[in-house]
Amino acid sequence: MFFNFLIPPNSFSSFPEYVAFVVSLSYALNATLLLLYSRIFGVEVKEKAFIPVTLSFVAIDFTSIQGLRLFVGIPAYLGVVILTSLCILEGLALALTSSLALVNASRRHLAATWIAANVASSGLFMAFVGVS
């Protein structure tokens, strides 16, 4: 999720504190979203797979964020296209990964849910940070 861009690195006394905070926040948010999905749609969670899957979400988040950082300073119209593409790609990756921790979950429904969550967080990103 692109919420990590909303946290300014200069608000921490050291870079390791910043990284620890962002990783913790990323894990907590993604784990909460996965549990919320399972409660709302009545899908059983595989307890043994939950922690490894949610930890992999952090890696997926940071891969997406690093991809987004490559495009800082591009024109706004192109930035929106790239941001939308990253939302879709990350949503598909998160859906595939989260299906490993859920019993009988629809991958299509998971993909739509994660893409919607990414679009919402990207809207926040564009509202607070913007695209140049």
From Swiss-Prot:
Transmembrane segments: 15-37, 49-71, 81-103, 110-129
Compartment annotation: Cell membrane
Keywords tagged on the record: Cell membrane, Membrane, Transmembrane, Transmembrane helix
Topological type in the membrane: Multi-pass membrane protein
Transmembrane in keyword set: yes
A cellular component annotation (GO) from this entry: plasma membrane
Protein name per Swiss-Prot or TrEMBL: Uncharacterized protein AF_2164
Species: Archaeoglobus fulgidus (strain ATCC 49558 / DSM 4304 / JCM 9628 / NBRC 100126 / VC-16)
Lineage: Archaea, Methanobacteriati, Methanobacteriota, Archaeoglobi, Archaeoglobales
